[in-house]
Amino acid sequence: MAAGGLSRSERKAAERVRRLREEQQRERLRQVSRILRKAAAERSAEEGRLLAESADLVTELQGRSRRREGLKRRQEEVCDDPEELRGKVRELASAVRNAKYLVVYTGAGISTAASIPDYRGPNGVWTLLQKGRSVSAADLSEAEPTLTHMSITRLHEQKLVQHVVSQNCDGLHLRSGLPRTAISELHGNMYIEVCTSCVPNREYVRVFDVTERTALHRHQTGRTCHKCGTQLRDTIVHFGERGTLGQPLNWEAATEAASRADTILCLGSSLKVLKKYPRLWCMTKPPSRRPKLYIVNLQWTPKDDWAALKLHGKCDDVMRLLMAELGLEIPAYSRWQDPIFSLATPLRAGEEGSHSRKSLCRSREEAPPGDRGAPLSSAPILGGWFGRGCTKRTKRKKVT
């Protein structure tokens, strides 16, 4: 035994005492928790005495309860009543008219009307997986631009919106007719694969989801560049990755737009990811010089306290009212006029079997030769950019 130290038996005895105290503390915590769940009138004198002697534990448990309730409220969807929503839309319309430089930030909530599930909503992919429920969705290539997508395109045509920054990978902004220069798809586009060996990078727009074989840190699609023969890669930025491609991420334009914006409209985004991008929020500017923020979302967002106005409503409902208030007609989406067909690079001979995803057709009756895609149906989400997100969340759930 070292001088002044404890013997082995003394250390073991001290450890037993420590564990006993911890167990006694846990048991006391359980007792106090059970008592706090009772109404005050139902508590016995002995229970009242125990609470009085355990003030620190009572404070800790009450704090935990408040935090749980707060998190629960944040996940709830709240809808403004129709009259209140119309009043807020009138205020939003005034802001849109008076904005000198309006930038729109969009999230998964603008595509739920196209049958593409979001992640964090009450019926979102991660929410359902956390509840142990299965997740299914229709073929994502069957999705079409929603009323919100088409409204944004019209607002850009009317020079009321200068730029769109999107978290979505579904390509619906591109397919709505919004110019490539007006979009920053920060997390990629499921229809675009690129050759990073060519300078500048050579893009290939396809009429099918190119991400069937790709995953986190594994981006090769199985096809090669028509010019240099290098393996093509998808453009998706998965959770845990940092996007490095110039296009379609277009970070340079997003940063420039944010720096010039005097108004930002957030549509259908939880902002839990976008809030982590300081360049989008002009945080280096004094508060008085930052853009005014307008948020459309049914749930709480971490930017609510900074918003000039929060509208609790579905994106399509709000945009329908907004366009009416602005006196603008919402263009109907036309599959025949979808820009993706003029932008797309056809597969070369021998590449037809390089994917099994359903290809887009100009009409639903038309099917390209060799297309092995299944008809529109609700089925488990497997593979691709969306399926990988589901798989990753499932793995996290098992670990925790």
UniProtKB/Swiss-Prot annotation:
It catalyses: N(6)-acetyl-L-lysyl-[protein] + NAD(+) + H2O = 2''-O-acetyl-ADP-D-ribose + nicotinamide + L-lysyl-[protein]; N(6)-glutaryl-L-lysyl-[protein] + NAD(+) + H2O = 2''-O-glutaryl-ADP-D-ribose + nicotinamide + L-lysyl-[protein]; N(6)-succinyl-L-lysyl-[protein] + NAD(+) + H2O = 2''-O-succinyl-ADP-D-ribose + nicotinamide + L-lysyl-[protein]; N(6)-propanoyl-L-lysyl-[protein] + NAD(+) + H2O = 3''-O-propanoyl-ADP-D-ribose + nicotinamide + L-lysyl-[protein]. Zn(2+) binds at residues 195, 198, 225, 228. Residues 82-329 form the Deacetylase sirtuin-type domain. The modification Asymmetric dimethylarginine is found at residue 388. NAD-dependent protein-lysine deacetylase and deacylase activities are activated by nucleic acids. Histone deacetylase activity is activated by DNA and nucleosomes. Protein-lysine deacylase activity is activated by RNA. H3K18Ac histone deacetylase activity is inhibited by methylation at Arg-388. H3K18Ac histone deacetylase activity is inhibited by deubiquitination by USP7. The keyword Thylakoid does not apply. The active site is at 187 (proton acceptor). GO terms for molecular function: chromatin binding; histone H3K18 deacetylase activity, NAD-dependent; hydrolase activity; metal ion binding; NAD+ binding; NAD-dependent protein lysine deacetylase activity; NAD-dependent protein-lysine depropionylase activity; protein methyltransferase activity. Phosphorylated during mitosis. Methylation at Arg-388 by PRMT6 inhibits the H3K18Ac histone deacetylase activity, promoting mitochondria biogenesis and maintaining mitochondria respiration. Residues 8-27 have a biased composition (Basic and acidic residues). Its cofactor is Zn(2+). NAD-dependent protein-lysine deacylase that can act both as a deacetylase or deacylase (desuccinylase, depropionylase, deglutarylase and dedecanoylase), depending on the context. Specifically mediates deacetylation of histone H3 at 'Lys-18' (H3K18Ac). In contrast to other histone deacetylases, displays strong preference for a specific histone mark, H3K18Ac, directly linked to control of gene expression. H3K18Ac is mainly present around the transcription start site of genes and has been linked to activation of nuclear hormone receptors; SIRT7 thereby acts as a transcription repressor. Interacts with UBTF and the RNA polymerase I complex. Interacts with components of the B-WICH complex, such as MYBBP1A, SMARCA5/SNF2H and BAZ1B/WSTF. Interacts with ELK4, leading to stabilization at target promoters for H3K18Ac deacetylation. Interacts with histone H2A and/or histone H2B. Interacts with DNMT1. Interacts with SIRT1. This is NAD-dependent protein deacetylase sirtuin-7. It comes from Homo sapiens (Human). The gene is SIRT7.
